[in-house]
Amino acid sequence: IELTASTATVAEAAQALGVQPGMIAKTMSFLQGDQAVLILTEGTAKVDNRKYKDTFHTKAKMIPFEDVERLIGHAPGGVCPFGVPDEVEIYLDESLRQFETVYPAAGNDHSAVKLTLSELEQAANAKGWVDVCREIETPV
């Protein structure tokens, strides 16, 4: 989906697509030593540092803004799990499972793609599912 409106942030993407923010599959970029790792989460989810360390046996360290495009192949605002270097490891967070379809970015800050979770898992060539996000608090 190519859009005239920006999809660089979860809020912008949700508004441009007319969906709830959680349906935006947010792609977060981490470094584990020299290894670039992408984790796709539900749009409003936040990474829980303890869960991340328990899962990956290292502290959560985001890739510095200025290094994202060089290491991932996409600039911030358009980072997605498609068309990345083969050595980049990709994981899907359990927070996504509450939705049947999600909208990850598609390589730039004016794009998205609608996928079912199984389509996303296959298209992203994900190594697997992880649980590294905080529990999402439901408003009362």
Locations of regions flagged by a protein language model:
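Extended, low-hydrophobicity, polar/charged segments
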Residues: 1-140
